[in-house]
């Protein structure tokens, strides 16, 4: 039978519940247990697909095409179990489901209320999510409850967790509470009062945490841990210090050293094999002892909030580990390139243009593409980054001066990139879309496999085929492909059913390393294996740096 660990947060948001939950999962998996994770989001949006990156950060796409919270990306990077749509749900989905049942008459005329109908639905979603785990029936399901204790939005989820713990019985569920212990510089000491109040608030709801994870900018002294233990009614050995570190991949070892997995296994009456964290130690060792160093420019419009590119940043870190190369990421606002030109890119070893939506900043990104192509600097364009690379090539090489995307200019006569109006989803069903379709849930989403053109750089990187995840509405227009290919551009991968361009590149006679991909490879990168595309990109950046150094010598 699956046992449950509920992870809650207090004092402030953004303390790292997702990292803490994923790290615990990694330790338990290293002990031979089958583990899955779920994220419960209290907002009323059905999913984060239409939310601003400045408010929500990255939208992580699962293999089965769900638009989910970025924490699911952490889950997949820390454990081997793949996440699905059922691993993330929101208040919006819960209410949508309950209202649908009420309209059908499932409640037989009863007054539908938060308790029991909403809380029962939350419990059903949790159990369904755990049961759908790709690892089979999990030994442990770790359930992260979004928001902060005390928020009105989180109350139904916390109440559902309390009820579920009671229903499952002793040793079937436990609670881990992540809280903040701030350092007050003027007083020169850590303050435990916020943690005491947070735990008190949680206990008022009827939940007594079994373990406290205390976030601070430094290790918490024993005296402060004893005080927290006394006022929170949590055993002293269950007050765990979680201080700031320079890599999230150090967290599993930190938590294991303080006995978190032992406490959880004891509470849930589990007796697995000892933890083996040698892989994590090796990853950290490689990350901290690189042999080389490169600087990659990431050109986007969300650079003020790097959470918008969380998986992409981590994918570059994974490539750093597996190429023994420190990757410095320089964030460049594309709108500044429109105003000031591309002189600020001259020192970069490679240029990356990530995915995005909307017209703002696109001409600055196109200028970055042009610079990378003409200066022979390695270029990787992801999703929108590929589309803009095609537009730049069409304008500046092929001579289609009005080439554009209908996303930015619906009236352009040279629609090099246009809306996909019909395509097949992962189940083989035809999906249709128009300019008037709803924004939510109308994109091409999820993992799709396609063959790669032999003899291309793409084949050297991936092999015979590629299986990656998508999140987009627009595609390169096949009507212009013959002109683009005549100019030298290579379409190196296409979807087998709709014949949609998936990858483009420039031949080695035109550029040493220039690749665009319509999919999002960052979603499948893990620290264990890295990702072939990002490893190749970092190696190309290093080669560019060495070529420049040789030319100067």
UniProtKB/Swiss-Prot annotation:
> What is annotated as the active site?
383 (nucleophile), 520, 522
Name the positions where UTP binds. 13, 191-196, 227
Instruction: Provide a GO CC annotation, any one.
Output: cytosol
Molecular function terms in GO for this entry? Answer: ATP binding; CTP synthase activity; glutaminase activity; identical protein binding; metal ion binding
Residues in Glutamine amidotransferase type-1 domain copies: 295-547
> Which InterPro entries does the record cross-reference, listed alphabetically?
Class_I_gatase-like (IPR029062), CTP_synthase (IPR004468), CTP_synthase_N (IPR017456), GATASE (IPR017926), GATase1_CTP_Synthase (IPR033828), P-loop_NTPase (IPR027417)
Q: Which residues bind ATP?
A: 14-19, 71
Query: Which annotated residues bind L-glutamine?
Result: 356, 384-387, 407, 473
Per its Swiss-Prot or TrEMBL record, what regulates the activity? Allosterically activated by GTP, when glutamine is the substrate; GTP has no effect on the reaction when ammonia is the substrate. The allosteric effector GTP functions by stabilizing the protein conformation that binds the tetrahedral intermediate(s) formed during glutamine hydrolysis. Inhibited by the product CTP, via allosteric rather than competitive inhibition.
Q: List the disulfide bonds.
A: none
What pathway, per the record? Pyrimidine metabolism; CTP biosynthesis via de novo pathway; CTP from UDP: step 2/2
Q: Specify which residues bind CTP according to the UniProt entry for this protein.
A: 13, 151-153, 191-196, 227
User: What residues does Mg(2+) bind to?
Assistant: 71, 144
Q: Name one Pfam family in it.
A: CTP_synth_N
Catalyzed reactions: UTP + L-glutamine + ATP + H2O = CTP + L-glutamate + ADP + phosphate + 2 H(+); L-glutamine + H2O = L-glutamate + NH4(+); UTP + NH4(+) + ATP = CTP + ADP + phosphate + 2 H(+)
Keywords of the record, alphabetical order, are:
ATP-binding, Glutamine amidotransferase, Ligase, Magnesium, Metal-binding, Nucleotide-binding, Pyrimidine biosynthesis
| Annotated region described as Amidoligase domain, given as residue ranges | 1-270
Q: Which PROSITE patterns match?
A: GATASE_TYPE_1
Q: Tell me, which GO biological process terms does this entry list?
A: 'de novo' CTP biosynthetic process; pyrimidine nucleobase biosynthetic process
Q: So what does this one do?
A: Catalyzes the ATP-dependent amination of UTP to CTP with either L-glutamine or ammonia as the source of nitrogen. Regulates intracellular CTP levels through interactions with the four ribonucleotide triphosphates.
Share any extra remarks.
Answer: CTPSs have evolved a hybrid strategy for distinguishing between UTP and CTP. The overlapping regions of the product feedback inhibitory and substrate sites recognize a common feature in both compounds, the triphosphate moiety. To differentiate isosteric substrate and product pyrimidine rings, an additional pocket far from the expected kinase/ligase catalytic site, specifically recognizes the cytosine and ribose portions of the product inhibitor.
**Record text on subunit structure and interactions:** Homotetramer.
Annotated family: Belongs to the CTP synthase family.
Q: What is this protein called?
A: CTP synthase
Native organism is: Burkholderia mallei (strain ATCC 23344)
The taxonomic lineage of its organism, from the top, reads:
Bacteria, Pseudomonadati, Pseudomonadota, Betaproteobacteria, Burkholderiales
């Amino acid at each position: 039978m699956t046992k449950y660990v509920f992870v809650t947060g207090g004092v402030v948001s953004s303390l790292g519940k997702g990292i803490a939950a994923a790290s615990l999962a990694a330790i338990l998996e290293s002990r031979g247990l089958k583990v899955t994770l779920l994220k419960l989001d209290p907002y009323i949006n059905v999913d984060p697909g239409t939310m601003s990156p400045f408010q929500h950060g990255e939208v992580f796409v699962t293999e089965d095409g769900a638009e989910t919270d970025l924490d699911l990306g952490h889950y997949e990077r820390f454990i081997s179990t793949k996440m699905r749509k059922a691993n993330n749900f929101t208040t919006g989905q819960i209410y949508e489901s309950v209202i649908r049942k009420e309209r059908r008459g499932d409640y037989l005329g009863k007054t539908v209320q938060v308790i029991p109908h909403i809380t029962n639905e939350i419990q059903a979603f949790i159990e369904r999510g755990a049961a759908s785990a790709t690892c089979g029936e999990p030994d442990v399901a770790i359930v992260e409850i979004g928001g902060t204790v005390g928020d009105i939005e989180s109350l139904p989820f916390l109440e559902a967790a309390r009820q579920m713990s009671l229903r499952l019985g002793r040793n079937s569920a436990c609670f881990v509470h992540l809280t903040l212990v701030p350092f007050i510089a003027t007083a020169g000491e850590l303050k435990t009062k916020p943690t005491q109040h947070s735990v008190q608030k949680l206990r008022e709801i009827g939940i007594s945490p079994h373990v406290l994870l205390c976030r601070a900018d430094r290790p918490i002294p024993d005296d402060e841990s004893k005080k927290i233990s006394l006022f929170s009614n949590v055993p002293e050995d269950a007050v765990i210090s979680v201080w700031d570190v320079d890599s999230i991949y150090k967290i599993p070892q930190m938590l294991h050293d303080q006995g978190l997995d032992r406490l959880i296994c004891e509470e849930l009456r589990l007796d697995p094999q000892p933890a083996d964290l040698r892989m994590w130690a090796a990853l950290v060792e490689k990350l901290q002892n690189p042999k080389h160093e490169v600087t990659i420019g990431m050109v986007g419009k969300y650079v003020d909030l790097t959470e918008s590119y969380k998986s992409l940043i981590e994918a570059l870190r994974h490539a750093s580990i597996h190429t023994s190369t420190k990757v410095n990421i320089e964030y460049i606002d594309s709108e500044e390139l429109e105003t000031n030109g591309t002189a600020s890119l001259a020192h970069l070893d490679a240029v990356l243009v990530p995915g995005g939506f909307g017209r703002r900043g696109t001409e600055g990104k196109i200028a970055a593409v042009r610079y990378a192509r003409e200066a022979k600097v390695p270029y990787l364009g992801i999703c929108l980054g590929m589309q803009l690379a095609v537009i730049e090539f069409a304008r500046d090489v092929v001579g289609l001066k009005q080439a554009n995307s209908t996303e930015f200019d619906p009236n352009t006569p040279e629609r090099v990139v246009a809306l996909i109006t019909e395509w097949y989803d992962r189940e083989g069903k035809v999906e249709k879309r128009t300019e008037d379709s709803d924004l939510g849930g109308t994109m091409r989403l999820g993992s799709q496999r396609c063959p790669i053109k032999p003899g291309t750089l793409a084949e050297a990187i991936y092999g015979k085929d590629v299986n990656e995840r998508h999140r987009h509405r627009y595609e390169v227009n096949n009507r212009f492909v013959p002109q683009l290919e005549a100019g030298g551009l290579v379409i190196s991968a296409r979807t087998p059913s709709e014949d949609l361009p998936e990858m483009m590149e420039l031949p080695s006679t035109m550029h040493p390393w220039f690749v665009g991909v319509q999919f999002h490879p960052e979603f499948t990168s893990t620290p264990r294996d890295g990702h072939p595309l990002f490893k190749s990109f970092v190696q190309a950046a290093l080669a560019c740096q060495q070529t420049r150094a040789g030319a100067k010598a």
